């Protein structure tokens, strides 16, 4: 008991929590955020400064997204963690308004940016101080199954007042890059590979077919404009879902892309026919992991599958000295599953922090479980 009390005191004594508006994010905090990333427990593009700040600025009305900030109470008040969060209404799994990690139509992964040496302490401070800031629960969508944060959340004691609830899980295509990337092409079914090669030959009959990869600061503004134009010229432009369809989407994309480009974490792969880009893939690279953010192709050549030809060439040119893994960032059922055999587990869950809300949540879940059991028994009896 004494040891637990001392641990509790240390959490409160050496770290605090605050909730900031976008207007309160200073240049100093931005610099600290950037410096925290190499020290983070988990890091992927969608919790990094280069994505999160443009999203907060461009995709939401003022005040919708807040920044949860952990600081150590040392002489420098060192930054220990940040996560943008937004309010969400009550739902059956959580019978009161709560918060969730910022989610956008362009966020295939969720998480928190926490210092690797202080992550457990940060979660304890969130448990203690979060309710006082109005954060009674925090939903985190699509956590990677191998993330350090998920491991810590799943290991939390299931005590009244605070616990981690897994709401759902899913899988998507993922790729571990082998030492010999040729193995990846050999792993594709003979029938599928034959079909891809036939399309490639037919397309090459129309002119010189070329593939190229451009990374970091070498990515040009012309390439970014080409990608945007390709996406907007297809069905996404017609449906109003392209990045160019609305000014705030375009502003977000341009600000975000330039930030990743300057950091050397942007990568484009392109398929060209007679020198003209007919497929473009916009990717990020962080911690030796690649992420496919968006793909676009010229629908004039749809019968040849230029998008999948672009991805096949990417597989053929993978460099295991540069990248260890690739995340497709797609929904289940994507065509990429035919050429990427591995799957990544993604978990969406809620960290409940308020004792009264926790008790109500547990009661609701027990009731729902009882209803399912009774329904099953009735169906069995009727059958």
Where are these regions (language model features)?
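Short catalytic-loop micro-motif centered on adjacent basic/acidic residues
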Residues: 138-140, 212, 325-327
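Active-site/acyl-donor-binding loops of N-acyltransferases
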Residues: 87, 150-182, 273, 321-383
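A conserved beta-strand-loop-helix scaffold within acyl/acetyltransferase catalytic domains
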Residues: 12, 16-99, 142-302
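Aromatic (often tryptophan-rich) hydrophobic motifs at membrane interfaces
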Residues: 94, 104, 115, 124-128, ...
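Short, high-confidence coil segments that cap the C-terminus of an alpha-helix
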Residues: 63-65, 118, 132-135, 266, ...
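N-terminal amphipathic/basic-hydrophobic helices that include classical n-h-c signal peptides
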Residues: 1-13
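Histidine-centered acyl-transfer/condensation active-site motif
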Residues: 126-130, 136-141
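The substrate-binding groove and active-site-proximal loops of carbohydrate-active enzymes
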Residues: 109-115
């Amino acid at each position: 008991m004494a040891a637990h009390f001392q641990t509790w005191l240390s959490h409160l004594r050496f770290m605090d929590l605050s909730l900031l508006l976008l207007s309160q994010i200073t240049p100093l905090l931005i610099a600290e955020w950037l410096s925290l990333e190499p020290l983070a427990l988990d890091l992927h593009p969608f919790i990094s400064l280069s994505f999160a700040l443009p999203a907060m600025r461009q995709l939401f009305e003022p005040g919708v997204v807040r920044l949860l900030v952990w600081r150590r109470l040392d002489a420098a008040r060192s930054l220990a963690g940040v996560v943008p969060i937004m309010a969400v209404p009550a739902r059956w799994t959580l019978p009161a308004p709560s918060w969730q990690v910022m989610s956008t139509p362009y966020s295939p992964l969720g998480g928190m940016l926490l210092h690797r040496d202080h992550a457990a302490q940060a979660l304890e401070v969130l448990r203690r101080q979060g309710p006082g800031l109005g954060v009674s629960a925090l939903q985190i969508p699509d956590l990677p199954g191998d993330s350090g944060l998920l491991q810590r959340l799943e290991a939390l004691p299931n005590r009244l007042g605070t616990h981690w609830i897994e709401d759902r899980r899913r899988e998507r295509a993922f790729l571990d890059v082998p030492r010999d990337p040729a193995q990846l092409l050999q792993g594709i079914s003979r029938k599928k590979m034959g079909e891809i090669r036939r399309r490639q030959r037919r397309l090459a009959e129309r002119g010189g077919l070329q593939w190229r990869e451009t990374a970091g600061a070498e990515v040009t503004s012309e390439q970014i404009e080409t990608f945007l134009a390709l996406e907007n010229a297809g069905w996404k432009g017609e449906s109003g879902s392209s990045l160019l369809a609305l000014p705030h989407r375009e502003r977000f994309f341009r600000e975000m892309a330039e930030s990743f480009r300057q950091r050397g974490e942007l990568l484009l792969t392109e398929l060209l026919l007679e020198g003209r880009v007919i497929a473009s893939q916009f990717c990020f690279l962080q911690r030796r992991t690649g992420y496919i953010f968006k793909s676009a192709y010229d629908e004039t050549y749809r019968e040849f599958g230029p998008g999948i030809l672009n991805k096949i060439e990417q597989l053929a040119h993978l460099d295991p000295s540069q990248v260890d893994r690739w995340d497709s960032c797609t929904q289940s059922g994507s065509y990429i599953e035919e050429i990427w055999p591995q799957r990544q587990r993604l978990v969406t869950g809620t960290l409940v922090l308020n004792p009264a809300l926790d008790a109500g949540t547990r009661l609701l879940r027990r009731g729902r479980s009882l209803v399912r059991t009774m329904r099953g028994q009735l169906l069995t009896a009727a059958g």
